[in-house]
Amino acid sequence: MVKASEKEHEKYKPKLFDLENVKKKNSSSRHFKRWNSDSALRIEDPDIDDGTVFKKTATSSIQPILPVLAMDEQPQPREATDEESQKDSGKREIISFLGYNEKFTRDQVILRFRGLQAKSCYFAYVTELEQMKDKFAKLLLGEDMSGGSKGVSSALALSNAITNLAASAFGEIRRLEAISEDKKERWRREIGWLLSVTDHIVEFSPTHQTNEDGSSMEVMTTKQRTDLVSNIPSLKKLDEMLLDCLDKFKDQDEFYYVTPGSPESENSNSTRNDDKWWLPIVKVPPKGLSETLKRFLLSQRECVCQVLNSAMAINSQVLTEMEIPESYIDSLPKKGRASLGDMIYRMITLEMFDAEQFLLEMDLSSEHKILDLKNKFEASVVIWQRKIVQIDNKSSSPWSTNLSMDKRQQLEERAATILQLIKQEFPGISQSTLDISKIQFNRDIGLAIVESYSRILESLAHTVMSRIEDVLEADQLTQNPELAMCKIHIVKETESPEKEEEPNFCLLEDRPKKQKPTISLSEVMQWNIETNEPRKEKSDKKLLTRVSSMIMSNNKKTTYLESLGTTRSPTAGRYS
């Protein structure tokens, strides 16, 4: 009986697939297995296409492995026990798997499918590995693909990589909607690659080490740099807060967007085609948004405002820690007065000086003018700071003047206050000349990563806040059509070339018949002396009457300290 079974086994052996020998083969074994399946199909049907061959060979890996039968032998069904019958009852059913209808148990299908999942995960891992190699190769080459000496520094290459990644992953957020899962997955994966560099930026720290004999000695050990330990986790949390905020708008259906130029947008009273012509127009129901959605939008705006303020604070601190390049210092004039101009210099040297009132009197009707004013004050701050440092060597210093130390410190503090107000009032403004110069010539990789990461989060938060304010503004204009007509009239006046040169002041609710004349410097000084009323009330009134400003829901201007202490949205929607 034993010999008969051995002979039967030898009879079946040539028909079995010798897996052990295939595993021992070299790389050609993979081609051997494919030749067995592909060639057999092509011999049977020479005209078969590649797609059919791939489908049949791919499904061969999930076919049930059955014992080989003899030529004349018929398959004998095995009688299952009662326990097996009860266990398999309800489990076995006809399942269509890759075009084949066979009777499999669900466990068999799951095992086969998990095998395919493992293969797909492996190929995804290989693809991600190649992407990582490509990205870090560009970083090591300094963005110079020729491999020459024209590449940028590692700090600037990482900064540009983070900036370009944010631009390609998020793009320009034109609608208040959730970001797709593919974009979020790509963003989290690739930003993790770039931030992993900070794990290897260390600093020496003294620690006490106890020897075997009980003696103690102080040794230097390495740990991650302190500023990176505090800033990187904070920025990651802000990143998640922004993505979660956008995800919450996934299922909303009360407002929608229409493309500019469509028939529905032409019938709208919105001025989006004028001040934000590149953005789709927000459409809300005729009766406006529901109270639930309004409260939700306000809460999300407060959350995004917190993210914006935190990212701005981190970015400002990092830029302050960066060294000022010598090329920027060489381009500065010798006096701060020459950088500001005579009129601005006289205004900031007044004994009764108010930074908020100063900004209200300046022409901030365009982003170019705001950026120009910011560049002037940053240059003057650098000049005065260098003079304060070099005050002890007046005879040999080219920066020496007749101004006293207290006067320079006072001017430097006033200029710094104005810069803080500009940054808080216009968070979406472009980078100044000093900031660009610092980023370009910075050599600290840790500071470069924190600065670029905080900058893109600041820009993203500002954009999301602007989209939320667009929806709230559309709801306000829908409920109050007269306000929309007033806004259209004001926008047309500001676009008129005849009225651009003169400062045009008008109330949004009560437009005066005559325009106020231009206020000269002497009138401003006399007004400051003779007026006994609080200057805050006039500041609030003039803020509402500024033609270049957008329609504001509040009639009270928030100061810089109030903006930092609360979550009120800054008036950042002008240039977004």
From Swiss-Prot:
InterPro entries reported in the protein's UniProt record: PRONE_dom (IPR005512), RopGEF (IPR038937)
Biased composition, class Polar residues, residue ranges: 557-570
Keywords in alphabetical order: Guanine-nucleotide releasing factor
Domain of life: Eukaryota
MF terms (GO), sorted A to Z: guanyl-nucleotide exchange factor activity
Domain PRONE span(s) in chain numbering: 119-485
Tissue-wise expression: Specifically expressed in mature flowers.
GO cellular component, one term: plasma membrane
Region (Disordered): 557-576
Subunit comment: Interacts with PRK6.
PANTHER family: ROP GUANINE NUCLEOTIDE EXCHANGE FACTOR 1, ROP GUANINE NUCLEOTIDE EXCHANGE FACTOR 13
Domain notes: The PRONE (plant-specific Rop nucleotide exchanger) domain is responsible for the GEF activity.
Described function: Guanine-nucleotide exchange factor (GEF) that acts as an activator of Rop (Rho of plants) GTPases by promoting the exchange of GDP for GTP.
Name recorded for this polypeptide: Rop guanine nucleotide exchange factor 13
Gene source species: Arabidopsis thaliana
Gene of this entry: ROPGEF13
